[in-house]
Amino acid sequence: MLKTLPPTIREKKRYISFKIIYNNELSGGEVVNLIRSSLINYYGVWGSSKCNPWLIDYTHPKGLLRITREEVDFVKSALISINEYKKNPINIIILGVSGTIKKSREKFLKVPHEKYYKVIQRRKKENSYKNRLRK
């Protein structure tokens, strides 16, 4: 088994809270594709892999994106540059940048962390129960 890296060697992360203004509701996969394509168009393949984007959470219209600390400005500018999706206008507003998921959810997404975590756990249990019923 591999040991975990000490905090001094780990990659430093930041969490960007954003809000999407769009006519229709987008799924998490569509948001991931939208973010990935905008980063590649704005920053290139090497730059987009360097910022290491990861969608932590998305519930329409707000979401949380994890990126590396050094690439915050590039990712923010790439997200702001998105203006069209499937020939419809779209706008992404950056609500803020935080160092932790908890503070980002409390400050920008206005969701208490503990309650939110319990809701996610309940949804996972419901989905696993539904999957068992399908089998």
From Swiss-Prot:
It holds the Pfam family RNase_P_Rpp14. It catalyses: Endonucleolytic cleavage of RNA, removing 5'-extranucleotides from tRNA precursor. GO terms for molecular function: ribonuclease P activity. One of its GO terms (cellular component) is ribonuclease P complex. It is found in: Cytoplasm. Keywords: Cytoplasm, Endonuclease, Hydrolase, Nuclease, tRNA processing. InterPro entries: Pop5/Rpp14/Rnp2-like, Rnp2-like_sf, Rnp2_archaea. Its EC number is 3.1.26.5. GO terms for biological process: tRNA 5'-leader removal. It comes from the Archaea. PANTHER family: RIBONUCLEASE P PROTEIN SUBUNIT P14, RIBONUCLEASE P_MRP PROTEIN SUBUNIT POP5. Belongs to the eukaryotic/archaeal RNase P protein component 2 family. Consists of a catalytic RNA component and at least 4-5 protein subunits. Part of ribonuclease P, a protein complex that generates mature tRNA molecules by cleaving their 5'-ends. This is Ribonuclease P protein component 2. The gene is rnp2.
